[in-house]
Amino acid sequence: MTEKFRKVFGGGKPVIAMVHLGALPGAPLHDAERGLEGLVDDARQDLTALQAAGVDAVMFGNENDRPYEFTADTASTATMAYVIGRLRALIAVPFGVNVLWDPMSTMALAAATGAAFVREIFTGHYASDMGPWTPDAGRAVRYRNRLGRSDLALLYNVSAEFAWSLDRRSLPDRARSAVFSSIPDAVLVSGAITGEPAELSDLLAVKNVLPDTPVLANTGVRHETVGDVLHVADGCIVGSALKVDGHTWNPVDPARAAEFMRLARAARGG
């Protein structure tokens, strides 16, 4: 386990819960009538429910900003900073941020809000719904350090959603190479889209080649599968399973979140 990962999450297998912000100003699905206060109110409700359920950490993301872009609008990043700032006094667990699909904006948002970790696609070469995808880990990680946040833990998603890798190497080889070349603090394995599970066989294959690097399930972990996932992986990021009816775009269901954490604690032996 890497030092930064341990410092942020402790020695266990963390459950990182998503706070999916509503569509931000400028995005096609933004609710202009409810405006910024609506974004804050909805995020506060989800954050409160997740923390009451006992999640280990939360991550703020802009999954509702569809169609997605590789370079986030400045207003989107600023709005995310505003919402997180309004909630900062209520956040009682480590928190992270992710501005889809923009590593530079994600780093800037983390620096502005004091986030402990970030998630993004930092490496690889993909064909995606958004077009050709060629992130630049070297540029992003250097930007983190220029912002004075060398302490920021980096969670690298090595199997991008909404995309197909153009790299002919196997997923374990891509993950192993990313750890060697681009110094992540953890590696994430995803399903095809938000809410769809990563294959347990993929998690196991990546973990087998990275015994000293945290490997987390990034998508699609459900109540029925969290035990099996945490048997293989070093933690998980979960969003859809904690929502009303298990639907990604619904608010958090306090009862579903509490039951998920009960199952996670049992799987972790506590």
Give the role of each language-model region.
Residues Q51-T79, H125-M130, P184-P197, D245-H247:
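Glycine-rich, proline-tolerant flexible connector loops at the mouths of alpha/beta enzymes
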Residues V15-V19, V58-F60, F95-V97, V118-E120, ...:
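Hydrophobic faces of well-ordered beta-strands that scaffold small-molecule active sites
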Residues V97, D102-A115, D173-R174, V206-P211, ...:
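Catalytic cores of alpha/beta
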Residues G11-G12, A17, E69-V97, P135-Y156, ...:
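Alpha-helix-loop-beta-strand connector modules within alpha/beta enzyme cores
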Residues T113-G131, S182-T194, T219-R222, V232-R256:
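Glycine-rich phosphate-binding active-site loops on the catalytic face of alpha/beta enzymes
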Residues H20-R44, F95-D102, Y156-P172, A217-H223:
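Active-site mouth loops of central-metabolism enzymes
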Residues L21-L24, S105, L109-A186:
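Conserved anion-binding
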